Amino acid sequence: MPKRVNFSRHLEKHWLDQVAIWSSQGIGKAELNANIERMLEHHVQCKVNRGKTRNQLMGIWFDASTVDEAWHNNAIGFVQQSENVPFILHWGMLIAKNYFFADVVRFIGRKSKHYDCFTYGQAQKYIAELYGDTETVKRSLRSVLKTLVDFEIILREKSGSYKPQVMGYEIEKKYKNWLVISLMQNRGTSSRSVLDLLDDLVWFPFSFTLSVNEIDQSLFELHQQGNNLVLFRK
C-alpha cells in the first residue's frame, strides 16, 4: 500500500452528506464541482483551500478510479435507499479511499484501549514514523483531527488533548459486507481472517460484529484455516 498523504483539508459531515446525495442523483462531474464550489463558498474563504476541499469531497463520493466500481456503486445505492445518509457510509468510504485517515484512526483506537486522552504530539510522533516528519504530514494530521472532532469521534479538551468517544454504534447488517470490502481495499488484500477484520482499530468507535450467517457468499468464499475463518473475495 502506498503511504500517500492525501488529507490536506478538514471535512464536515454535512458537506459529505450533501455531496453523497448529489452523487446519488447521477449528476455529472462539472455540475457536481460547481455545486460543491457554491456550497463551500461561505465556509472556506480561500479559493485555493476551497479547491482542495472540493477535490477531497469529490474523491470520496464521486471518483471511483481507485476502488472497486461495484463497491462504490453499492454505496451510492445505499444513499438512494436512505432518507438520511448513514454516517457509516462516510466512514467506509474514508477508510477505503484514504489510507492516511485510516492510519490516524488506528492510532486513536489503540490509544483509546489504554488511555482516556491523547495529545497532538503523541499522534504526530506516530504518524511521522509512517509518513515522515514534514509540514505536509503535520497539516494533514491536523485536518484529520479537526474532521474527527466534527464527526464527534473525538472531543477537544480544554487542556489541548483529545478524548476518543466510543459510540458503540451498532452497524446494520446490510452494511457489514460492504464495510468488510472497504477494509480489504484499505489493506490492499483480497483475503483476511474474520477475527482480523473485526479487530482492526478503524472500527474503534463502533460495535462491529459479523456472524457466518451474515457473510454474503456471493461476494466471499469462506475457508477454515486452523482456528481462523478466512474470507476470500470472489
Predicted features by range, described:
Residues 110-178:
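Conserved binding-pocket/active-site segment within a compact domain
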Residues 14-23, 90-116, 171-192:
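Positively charged, polyanion-binding regions of nucleic-acid-associated proteins
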Residues 49, 100, 137-140:
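Short amphipathic alpha-helical segments
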Residues 157-233:
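Accessory, usually C-terminal, subdomains that scaffold auxiliary metal cofactors
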Residues 1-95, 106-107, 118:
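Eukaryotic partner-binding/assembly regions in large regulatory complexes
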Residues 31-36, 114-128, 188-201:
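Short acidic, hydrophobic short linear motifs in intrinsically disordered regions
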Residues 37-47, 125-136, 195-209:
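Short helix-coil junctions and helix-kink-helix linkers
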Residues 51, 55-57, 141-151, 211-223:
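Basic amphipathic alpha-helical segments that dock to polyanions
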